[in-house]
Amino acid sequence: MSSDRKVLSFEEVSKHNKTKDCWLIISGKVYDVTPFMDDHPGGDEVLLSSTGKDATNDFEDVGHSDTARDMMDKYFIGEIDSSSVPATRTYVAPQQPAYNQDKTPEFIIKILQFLVPILILGLALVVRHYTKKD
């Protein structure tokens, strides 16, 4: 790592989001991973999808090896100005209504309203067929 620590704004880092110019923010540090794009085992799409945001969770979720973590040092270019990083939004799953057993009889009634007339019609056709005089 370089001794003069450069502090970069989130806006500046987020501009570098292309295959030939790719910077990532991981654990408050900025890495220029452009030279590593072709060599990344997950492909360049994985790296590109982590641009323009704090990629710490993306990086940690994969479970990188110690070797991979050591490799990061050569791509380090500075630190992120934490005040310029937008607050992360936590995902809140939509609430699903609880299963209501009272609706099950309604479903059965709807099925019966459909099937009973068909059965009556079928029975009428069978009776007519067998009682018809030749």
UniProtKB/Swiss-Prot annotation:
Domain Cytochrome b5 heme-binding: 5-81
Coiled-coil positions: none
Membrane topology of this protein: Single-pass membrane protein
Pfam families the record matches: Cyt-b5
Keywords on record: Cell membrane, Electron transport, Endoplasmic reticulum, Heme, Iron, Membrane, Metal-binding, Transmembrane, Transmembrane helix, Transport
Tissue: Expressed in roots, stems, leaves, flowers and siliques.
Taxonomy, superkingdom: Eukaryota
Residue numbers covered by motif AKR2A-binding sequence (ABS) required for endoplasmic reticulum membrane targeting: 128-134
Gene Ontology cellular component terms for the protein in this record: chloroplast thylakoid membrane; endoplasmic reticulum; endoplasmic reticulum membrane; membrane; plant-type vacuole; plasma membrane; plastid
Localization per record: Cell membrane; Endoplasmic reticulum membrane
Membrane-spanning intervals of the chain: 107-127
MF (Gene Ontology): heme binding; metal ion binding
Entry binding sites for heme: 40, 64
Main location: membrane
Oligomer status and interactors: Interacts with CER1, BI-1, FAH1 and FAH2. Interacts with AKR2A.
Stored PANTHER family: CYTOCHROME B5 (PTHR19359), CYTOCHROME B5 ISOFORM E (PTHR19359:SF135)
Known role: Membrane bound hemoprotein which function as an electron carrier for several membrane bound oxygenases, including fatty acid desaturases.
Entry protein name: Cytochrome b5 isoform E
Source species: Arabidopsis thaliana
